[in-house]
Amino acid sequence: MQTNVVSAQEWEAARQNLLLKEKALTHARDAMAAERRRMPWLAVEKNYEFDTPKGKASLRDLFEGRHQLIVYRAFYEPGVFGWPDHACRGCSMVADQVAHVAHLNARDTTLAFVSRAPQADIARQKARMGWEMIPWYTITDSFDADFDVGEWHGTNVFFRDGDKIFRTYFINSRGDEQMGGTWNYLDITPLGRQEVWEDSPAGYPQTPTYKWWNWHDSYVEGAAPDKRWVEVSDAGEAAFRNKQAGAKP
């Protein structure tokens, strides 16, 4: 494996040079966030209904009285790899990394996950995986299709002004990585995520993208990726890419 061992002075000089670029990236990210806050809003005209542990609820109810609502579409339902014992591996990783929601609530913001699994299955899965803190509801209508998450994970953001609800933001695919600490932590290590798409020095370990993902209670050190998961992951990625390509003008 290629390495470059230098003196303390040379190391500090390299770190300072990288720090300048990191600060520029931070400023660019701040500018992007400012632009995001100025995005136009889209009025939500339809009424949507969800199953919850307490019965039926509207989209407005999901705000829990707050003004902002973040909705992550997690794939846990019949037909998903791992069902009914597990949710999608990627969605499970996102759920594992949700911070204490009190911090979001303190900023007038509610986080919710939605899937098509029945509430009984969601409750069992939350208890087993330690996700009790995440409000997780069942989609009962066209909510997922209407908000671009019918076939792929994604995050929608809504704002409530009285009884009026607006869609203010949407992101999916790799954009959802910013909601997960695992990827950010790995990005500051010398080996990175160790996936084949990364630009790393020759000889650094790399494996097929996403294939190492697993449920947090199912990792086996040194074990090869599950063949069925590889097939499902590849098929899902291909379908998503083809759909994206077909949508381009």
Please place each PLM-identified region on the residue numbering.
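Non-globular targeting/processing and membrane-anchoring segments
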Residues: 1-107, 124-128, 141-249
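Conserved segment of the thioredoxin-like fold in thiol-based oxidoreductases
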Residues: 109-138
